[in-house]
Regions:
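Phosphate-binding glycine-rich loop
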Residues: 2-47, 61-65, 71, 137
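PLP-dependent aminotransferase-like
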Residues: 38-126, 133
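Proline-centric
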Residues: 73, 352-360
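Basic phosphate/pyrophosphate-binding loop/patch that engages nucleotide-derived ligands
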Residues: 113-121, 163-181, 274-283
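Active-site region of PLP-dependent enzymes
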Residues: 129-135, 142-261
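Conserved PLP cofactor-binding pocket of PLP-dependent enzymes
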Residues: 183-193, 235-240, 276-350, 379-383
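Short, conserved charged micro-motifs
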Residues: 269-275, 360-365
Length: 383
């Protein structure tokens, strides 16, 4: 394809970083999800399995295409539980969206194996785990297609932006058509009209050159950003391992964790709430520009039962699309709290804390001291 400037250079550099042949920059992570699912041909009469812990855009991208999202419970990695996933597969299941949440890779290998064995597509949502890996293999390379987000809160950002990556040329060309004018392009950048499968309705998700230039610089910075966060997190985490009363999130591969978030889980929701308030009193507090230390029940549209449009099955149009479509008549459409009991319990008993890339050792000491004081008071000897 003819060189388009900063955006295409970023696409080539990001693809090389992941070890994949194709990357397509788009205007947002949500746009990346919509583009990926559109390229896969998702539509009415199909079901897509999604985790109970994700971002609202995951289910929105499925619903907007006329398919039905099916919830799967999570495990102690805070990713999809492979055993529960198997129980959610029906004859209508078309694919799985596996989400690497809160900075660390989920247990993706058994999910990928299930997808292969059942003939399902696998989309990796890497929006919160850019730079993560499992035994050296980067997230985003285990499935058929993956998406990334470069929104303002991400470890690599252009304010807004996203990317679709794949090793499948046909899928890439369909994604190009979706994100652009509805047609793919040849190697010279000219629109292709002769292949009916590549003639779709375009969405206009193109990324602009300014953000492409920013992302090229950010990509070069990302390894040190991830290293700083990981070093801070695991210094804190090592200290917390010695404290009573908490359980740390299971990390599939600590060397591949981006270090962006630290999740701690307690015996009961009441204890979690009290510890959260006590940590805030010690100065580990939320701040206007972002997340510092909150109970996971405050984590908004990342929790399935907080997505009101999903719970109420809100329609795209007045005719009830997609819920009332005859193609979707036999699909289960239940999303109330209680559908995913493991997730419900973890959300109620856990605290999530962000780990900035700019923490000093004195900041890490303050966090460790606050946890030590609070945990020994509530869960151990107050000495």
């Amino acid at each position: 394809m003819k060189l388009r400037g900063e955006v295409e250079q970023f696409e080539r550099e990001f693809a090389a970083y992941l070890g994949l042949p194709y990357a397509l920059a788009v205007s947002s992570g949500t746009g990346a999800l919509h583009t990926a699912l559109s390229a896969l041909g998702i539509g009415p009469g199909q079901e897509v399995i999604v985790p109970a812990y994700m971002w609202v855009a995951v289910v929105a991208s499925v619903v907007n295409l006329g398919a039905i999202p099916i919830l799967a419970d999570i495990d102690d990695t805070f990713g999809i539980n492979p055993e529960d996933l198997l129980s959610r597969i029906t004859p209508r299941t078309r694919g799985i969206i596996a989400v690497h949440m809160s900075g660390a890779p989920m247990n993706i290998k058994p999910i990928a194996q299930i997808a292969r064995e059942r003939g399902l597509f696998l989309v990796e949502d890497c929006a919160q785990a850019n730079g993560a890996s499992i035994t050296g293999q980067k997230v985003g390379t285990f499935g058929d297609v993956a998406i990334f987000s470069f929104q303002m809160n991400k470890n690599m950002t252009s304010g807004e932006g996203g990317c679709v990556v794949t090793r499948d040329l046909r899928l890439y060309r369909r994604a190009v058509a979706v994100h652009d004018l509805g047609y793919s392009r040849d190697d010279q950048g000219r629109l292709m009209f002769d292949d009916p499968d590549l003639c779709v309705w375009g969405r206009g998700y193109r990324l602009d050159e300014l953000r492409g230039a920013i992302l090229r610089v950010q990509l070069r910075k990302m390894p040190i950003i991830v290293q700083n966060m990981r070093n801070s997190k695991y210094r804190i985490r090592k200290a917390l391992e010695q404290l009573p009363g908490l359980k740390l999130r299971r990390i599939v591969d600590p060397t591949g964790d981006t270090g962006a978030f630290l999740i701690t889980t307690y015996d009961t929701p009441t204890i979690a709430k009290e510890i959260n308030h006590a940590l805030r009193a010690e100065g580990i507090t939320t701040y206007p520009q972002g997340l510092s230390n909150i109970r996971m029940t405050e984590w908004g549209l990342h929790l399935y039962y907080n997505i009101v449009s999903l719970i109420r099955r809100r329609s795209i149009d007045r005719l009830g699309f997609p819920w009332n479509l005859v193609e979707n008549a036999t699909s289960e459409k239940h999303y109330d709290k209680g559908m995913c009991p493991v997730a419900d319990s973890l959300f109620e008993r856990s605290i999530i804390m962000s780990i900035p890339s700019c923490l000093k050792s004195t900041d890490e000491d303050d966090i460790i001291q606050a946890f030590t004081k609070v945990l020994r008071h509530y869960c151990g000897n107050d000495s």
